[in-house]
Regions:
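Alpha/propeptide regions of enzymes that mature by internal proteolysis
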Residues: 32-190, 197, 219-251
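Start-of-helix register in tetratricopeptide repeats
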Residues: 242, 283, 318, 352-353
Length: 365
């Protein structure tokens, strides 16, 4: 056997590989029977995709989003390359409907695709190829496109769109509500397995949000939408509260106080919802309580959440510090000193931060 290939053989091998890759791109991909929504928020300029399927790791291939450009869902007999191609066209300023026509022109197997697109101005388009498996179809409206294939029936898409229109709150909240409504209407008639949500939001100070403001995946689960809801609620306390405060600071620096206040308000509303649903995760409660207390908003709720977190994890000095801060900001220095003293004792006096906090509370500053 030769130890190496000749130059001529390498050229033939390279040509063969190129032909195989070209054929793979042109051919229908693995079927992704699924339902999805692509959507736009005119207030925050967020764009995103939420999706569920009886397919492992649907979030790997279906959702694409870029702030200032738009969002795309690629499904059915999926050609994954159409996702980034569509984003590039949207980024150039091409409206959603024109992007769809452009994709059809470059894909010889477009009849097997299902695609939803929303652009950064709220324009939307959906396409279901004649080779998509029944029931398959879509619906568009201002700022959204819903679509699905191998569904229980047309009510899946109709109810998904209706829930999105009627649900209030953040874009992610509205999109997850849309998935829940679609599943309630019958969903993917083969069942459930994975779900995902991807949202991008413009930011100059935090450029990472331009591609990933919210990104959550449930790869393999008996009830993936229910699990997506659960991890979304955790995500709000761990990450989203901080993101809202980042936007608030950026808007404040630009002199846009109304927008800064709106970002802080969203943190408070998230905390209120966590309390209302009986959230038990001490980390979630602590994150939201600290975000509110440190910004002097929703202070009674911050005290309540922090106390609930302490009850669940009574020797966690970080959580005790949050409770003390919330009491202090609420005007109860005596209680703040009592709680912070407990934190210092548990810590054994090692943390200078905790000791400084105690000094601050005693000084009334």
């Amino acid at each position: 056997m030769p130890r190496s290939l000749s130059l001529s053989a390498l050229r033939h091998l390279s040509a063969a590989i190129a032909l195989v890759l070209a054929a793979a791109l042109a051919a229908p991909g693995a079927a992704r029977a699924t339902f999805s929504i692509v959507a736009y928020d005119s207030l925050t300029q967020e764009v995103g995709v939420a999706v569920q399927s009886k397919y492992f790791s649907v979030g790997y291939a279906v959702p694409w989003a870029l702030a200032g450009a738009g969002a795309v869902a690629t499904q059915a007999n999926v050609n994954v390359s159409l996702g980034p191609r569509a984003i590039a066209l949207l980024k150039s300023g091409m409206p959603a409907a024109e992007v769809m026509r452009a994709l059809a022109a470059i894909d010889s197997s477009f009849a097997g695709r299902q695609i939803g697109i929303v652009d950064a101005r709220g324009g939307s388009a959906t396409y279901t190829g004649p080779r998509a498996m029944d029931w398959a179809g879509g619906e568009t409206g201002p700022g959204y496109a819903c679509q699905g294939n191998i569904l229980a029936g047309p009510a899946v898409v109709a109810d998904m769109a209706k829930a999105f229109r009627e649900t209030k709150g953040e874009l992610a909240e509205r999109m997850i509500a849309a998935l829940e409504a679609a599943q309630k209407a019958g969903g993917d008639k083969r069942g459930q397995q994975s779900a995902a949500i991807l949202i991008a939001r413009p930011s100059r100070t935090n450029p990472e949000y331009n591609e990933r403001y919210v990104e959550l995946h449930v790869e393999d689960h008996k009830t993936p939408i229910k699990e997506l809801r659960r991890v979304w609620e955790i995500f709000q306390g761990f990450h989203l509260a901080g993101a809202h405060l980042n936007y608030a600071a950026a808007f404040e620096a630009e002199g846009r106080k109304d927008l800064a206040d709106a970002e802080r308000q969203r943190v408070g509303e998230t905390l209120q919802r966590a309390l209302a649903r009986g959230e038990k995760d001490p980390s979630v409660l602590n994150g939201l309580a600290w975000a509110c207390a440190s910004n002097d908003i929703f202070l009674p709720q911050a005290v309540q959440a922090a106390q609930r977190a302490v009850d669940a994890d009574p020797r966690n000095v970080d959580i005790l510090d949050t409770l003390a801060e919330a009491h202090f900001r609420s005007g109860n220095a005596v209680k703040a000193i009592e709680v912070e003293s407990r934190a210092v004792t548990i810590d054994g006096g090692k943390s200078q931060y905790l000791k400084d906090q105690l000094t601050r509370f005693r000084g009334g500053k």
